[in-house]
Amino acid sequence: MRVQVITCDADHLAAAVDDPPALAARLGAAVPEGLIEDEFRASFRSAREELLRRPEILCWGTALFLLEEPRVICGMGGYKGPPDDGGVVEIGYSIAPSLRGRGLATEAAGELVRMAFADPRVRWVRAHTLAQPNASTRVLEKLGFRKIGELIDPAEHPDPIWRWRLDRPRPP
């Protein structure tokens, strides 16, 4: 596999917000232009605050995607939180604009799914995309997700979104 998923601890998240070059040095990897934009800095800040309050959620938070050759932080994503009472966990992912179109999102999202199903509490994985065919919908389709509906919630999203689901594989 070309992409490694690195779970972010509080120090990773602080460096992503305040000093991306220090984060790159810590991981021995380059940070491509456009990866850590202002919209993500706010997410990293809130993820760090939540992690400091609840350290037990470490593996269910933000992750960085590391391309092994050349060694570069190619994206970010992770989970929206630990599995809920119904055994559902939600994933999200983003790849640096300069590295899109190479299958990296499929690899990273696939690894997030594999890691989620390694926890016996997880019954299915959820994802959301814009309500139109796009690169993200193709990633989910390649991984076996199925579209289960459309969500319209102007308070959360200005545009409609599609909901996707991937059930835990049945044992052979």
Regions found by a protein language model. Name each.
Residues 1-90, 95-98, 114-115, 119, ...:
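GNAT-family acyltransferases
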Residues 135:
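Conserved SAM/SAH-binding loop-helix junction
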Residues 125-129:
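Conserved hydrophobic beta-strand within the GNAT/NAT acetyltransferase core sheet
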Residues 93-95, 101-116, 138-142:
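Conserved acetyl-CoA-binding loop-helix of GNAT-fold acetyltransferases
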